Amino acid sequence: ANILSYEMIIAVIGDSSCSPEETKLAETVGELLAQQGVTVICGGLGGVMEAVCRGAKSKGGLTVGILPGQDSSMANSWVDIPVVTGIGEARNVPVVKSAQAVIAIGGGYGTLSEIAYALKSRIPIIGLNTWSLSRNEREDDSIIRVQSATEAVDKAISLAKRHKNYEIASLRSQ
């Protein structure tokens, strides 16, 4: 039933403290990604990260948490693979760079830094109730804005399929 057999990795980013609406969005995104056989990668802690992992696990998905500290027990209960880094917020770089697409849900300045890393690395970024950018007073539409969890996941998967990291992963598994 897992269409993509976990080769595709999509990062879901957002705040460690989030609204009930963002929690529900993240959980639904996790469920939908797992149903498509996508590996979910995130910062491994609470809030949006916990909700997306909980959603993914409820549908039998695979979750990876890139942790800021030295201790794997800091990971939320729904992380399958906790990656201990000891590098604090610098862990935002591998969260994003490991993925073929990124879904941002809400978020504070940590999420904004991840959005910037994704844009700089040409990794497609889909936004649900998240930051908007402007440059010289002009709207910068680099973040692909969507209105629902379903739209976010559909868009992320279709863009991830065209990303160079995914093409390499699919070749390796043949």
Language-model features, listed with the residues they occupy:
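A cross-taxon signal for low-complexity, glycine/charged-rich
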Residues: A1-L4, R172-Q174
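Glycine-rich beta-alpha loop segments
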Residues: N2-V64
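Acidic/glycine-enriched connector segments
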Residues: K24, G46-S121, N129-S132
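Short acidic-hydrophobic, aromatic-tinged amphipathic segments that line or gate anion-handling sites
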Residues: P82-G86, L128, I143-A152
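A charged, well-structured terminal subsegment
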Residues: K97, A101-V102, V146-Y166
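Acidic, glycine-centered active-site loop in nucleotide-sugar glycosyltransferases
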Residues: E137-S142
